[in-house]
Structures are given as structure tokens and as C-alpha cells.
């Protein structure tokens, strides 16, 4: 497994992986519009986005961040792991990469917005606290970097 900056050649494979990940969670698969143009929605704004690729260069995870305007904080976005690849440390490795990228760009705190209800998104609600995130209001967690 290798984590690398997103490139457009991974677009379709990443979108397919995200749809599979949502389906595995019992959600109706739909695509978030920001994933259709990572360059415009992340890189052109000074934000970052990564993918995790397996040994066959297939996308098995993704995630990025966007700075909160007027602050030294950023939201983590679209941290997804392919269902068959969960519990192998890929999510933790992606999160660490995202946090290192944030620190390198002067970001001092990371935030994450979690979906509702928590029972359907139990993995997210347990994943982030294991990595030092604490809830600061319902459905939102934060970590000082």
C-alpha cells in the first residue's frame, strides 16, 4: 500500500471506491460533487487530497482537507476506505498523512464533521477518538495538531 497525492488518472477508480464504501455501509451510493474535480475543489484552493493505492495501483482509500477561512484550522473531508481493506491500518495511515500535510501548511487544529445518526456511522464515531479527536459539539470533533 502506498499513500500519494491525488492525480487525475485516479479519478474514476477513486469515485468507484467511494461508491463501494458507501454501499458497504448500507447507504444509498451517491457521489459528493467535490470529488468530481479534486484539482479545482482542493489543490487550486491551497488544500490537499491523497489516495491510498494497493500493489496493483488501485485506489483503496482517500482523504483530504480544506482550510477554514480566516483560521489556522481545517476540516478533514472524504476519508473513505474500501470495505474489503478496512482494519489494516490504511485509515490511520491516511489520517496521519493528512495531519502531517496540515501541519506543514501552518494548520494548528483539525476538525471533522460526522454524519447522523451515529449508529449508522459507528466506525467514524469510534475511529477519530482513537486518534485524539474529541467532540466539541454534536457531530463535530476536533484535534490540536
Q: Which functions belong to the PLM regions below?
A:
Residues 5-77, 82, 95, 101, ...:
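Acetyl-CoA-dependent GNAT
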Residues 128-138:
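Conserved acetyl-CoA-binding loop of GNAT-fold acetyltransferases
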Residues 95, 119-124, 140-145:
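Short glycine/proline-centered loop/turn elements that form peptide/ligand docking sites
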Amino acid at each position: 500500500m502506498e499513500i500519494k497525492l491525488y492525480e487525475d488518472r485516479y479519478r474514476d477508480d477513486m469515485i468507484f471506491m467511494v461508491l463501494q464504501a458507501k454501499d458497504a455501509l448500507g447507504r444509498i451510493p451517491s457521489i459528493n460533487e467535490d470529488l468530481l474535480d479534486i484539482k479545482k475543489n482542493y489543490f487550486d484552493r491551497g488544500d490537499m487530497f491523497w489516495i491510498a493505492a494497493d500493489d496493483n495501483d488501485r485506489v483503496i482509500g482517500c482523504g483530504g482537507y480544506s482550510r477554514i477561512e480566516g483560521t489556522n484550522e481545517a476540516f478533514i473531508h472524504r476519508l473513505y476506505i474500501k470495505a474489503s481493506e478496512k482494519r489494516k491500518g490504511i485509515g490511520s495511515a491516511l489520517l496521519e498523512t493528512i495531519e502531517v500535510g496540515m501541519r506543514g501548511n501552518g494548520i494548528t487544529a483539525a476538525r471533522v464533521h460526522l454524519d447522523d445518526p451515529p449508529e449508522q456511522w459507528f466506525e467514524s464515531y469510534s475511529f477519530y477518538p482513537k486518534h485524539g479527536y474529541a467532540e466539541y459539539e454534536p457531530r463535530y470533533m476536533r484535534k490540536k495538531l
